[in-house]
């Protein structure tokens, strides 16, 4: 393993254990040249389906892009980074369970909207307004009416 600090290729493994969530092997290493320590993780390589965009082009799935779009919708909302990561993991599990080589971006968008609806209704509306290309206020009103009908009143 190449040292991230000096680039030397010889490192010594000091400790090996399973990560807390059990999906990776965590290794603590020491560079034999500069003596600095660092941690590496080994994970199973998963093959996600390619995403087919509206214009027909295909792009590789990236967790970072999904996370960025969700974080944008959740900006300044009271939702923890952990809750976002858990939602992304649920989306990824659904994508893998499909067993497809390609899926339309619209299907990913619907999965994101389901998770955002559970996390934060304002974030859901933000995402839906862009994803569904809302043109006027009536489309926002339709979503708000949908929430009002599905939410029990307090009191």
Swiss-Prot record:
GO terms, biological process: negative regulation of DNA-templated transcription
Chain segments annotated as transmembrane: none
The keyword tRNA processing is annotated on this UniProt entry: no
Pfam families registered for this protein in UniProt: ATP-cone, Zn_ribbon_NrdR
Keyword annotations: ATP-binding, DNA-binding, Metal-binding, Nucleotide-binding, Repressor, Transcription, Transcription regulation, Zinc, Zinc-finger
Residue ranges of domain ATP-cone in the record: 49-139
Top-rank taxon, per record: Bacteria
GO molecular function: ATP binding; DNA binding; zinc ion binding
Cofactor annotation comment: Binds 1 zinc ion.
Required cofactor(s): Zn(2+)
InterPro entries tied to this protein: ATP-cone_dom, NrdR-like_N, RNR_NrdR-like
PROSITE patterns per record: ATP_CONE (PS51161)
Functional summary from the UniProt entry: Negatively regulates transcription of bacterial ribonucleotide reductase nrd genes and operons by binding to NrdR-boxes.
NCBIfam families found in the cross-reference section: transcriptional regulator NrdR (TIGR00244)
Protein name: Transcriptional repressor NrdR
Provenance organism: Cupriavidus necator (strain ATCC 17699 / DSM 428 / KCTC 22496 / NCIMB 10442 / H16 / Stanier 337)
Taxonomic path: Bacteria, Pseudomonadati, Pseudomonadota, Betaproteobacteria, Burkholderiales
């Amino acid at each position: 393993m190449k040292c991230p600090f000096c680039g030397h290729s010889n490192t010594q493994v000091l400790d090996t254990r399973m990560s807390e969530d059990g999906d990776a092997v965590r290794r603590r290493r020491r560079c034999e040249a500069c003596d600095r320590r660092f941690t590496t993780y080994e994970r199973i390589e998963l093959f996600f389906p390619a995403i087919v965009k509206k214009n027909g082009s295909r792009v590789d799935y990236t967790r970072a892009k999904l996370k960025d779009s969700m974080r944008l919708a959740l900006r300044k909302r009271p939702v923890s980074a952990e809750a976002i990561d858990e939602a992304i993991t649920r989306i990824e599990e659904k994508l893998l369970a499909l067993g497809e080589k390609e899926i339309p971006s619209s299907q990913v968008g619907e999965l994101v909207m389901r998770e955002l609806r559970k996390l934060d209704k304002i974030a859901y509306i933000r995402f839906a307004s862009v994803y569904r290309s809302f043109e006027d206020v009536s489309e926002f009103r339709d979503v708000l009416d949908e929430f009002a009908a599905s939410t029990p009143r307090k009191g």
